């Protein structure tokens, strides 16, 4: 089975990577799909985000990382995927994922959704919270990979 794990990953957190590692255990092939939205650019380019994830998942042979734009169901179809993986942290995530599930099913009934609960230590972790912590001089260790932490500090210093 081919699965897609889509997201902005701006930047990728250890919570994101935890979901990817767990999902890779029950998929033949997992594609981490980095959403590239030119209308809403992130702090890091799609290419940078793809590279950060690739550096973090080198030990997972059945996982690849690609960027995409447009509708995620179209990308999933193009990749031959029949399953979308999403991580759930708190209740608000469930509501958002349910909305997306209903719309994606309307667009393509052949693509299913699998939600994985975040591990407890990552339930309140988000990429925007990480950026705020680093901007305010806080310690991001244990929240993002070291190579991402270095890149984030450098990027924020130049903004």
Curated annotation (Swiss-Prot):
The record marks 16 as: Transition state stabilizer. One of its GO terms (cellular component) is cytoplasm. ATP binds at residues 16, 87-89, 97, 122-128. Keywords: ATP-binding, Coenzyme A biosynthesis, Cytoplasm, Magnesium, Nucleotide-binding, Nucleotidyltransferase, Transferase. The keyword Nucleotide-binding applies. Its cofactor is Mg(2+). It is an enzyme of class 2 (transferase). Substrate binds at residues 40, 72, 86. It comes from the Bacteria. Pathway: Cofactor biosynthesis; coenzyme A biosynthesis; CoA from (R)-pantothenate: step 4/5. Its main location: cytoplasm. It is found in: Cytoplasm. It catalyses: (R)-4'-phosphopantetheine + ATP + H(+) = 3'-dephospho-CoA + diphosphate. One of its GO terms (molecular function) is pantetheine-phosphate adenylyltransferase activity. GO terms for biological process: coenzyme A biosynthetic process. Its EC number is 2.7.7.3. The keyword Transit peptide does not apply. InterPro entries: Cyt_trans-like (IPR004821), PPAT (IPR001980), Rossmann-like_a/b/a_fold (IPR014729). Homohexamer. HAMAP family: PPAT_bact. Belongs to the bacterial CoaD family. Reversibly transfers an adenylyl group from ATP to 4'-phosphopantetheine, yielding dephospho-CoA (dPCoA) and pyrophosphate. This is Phosphopantetheine adenylyltransferase. The gene is coaD.
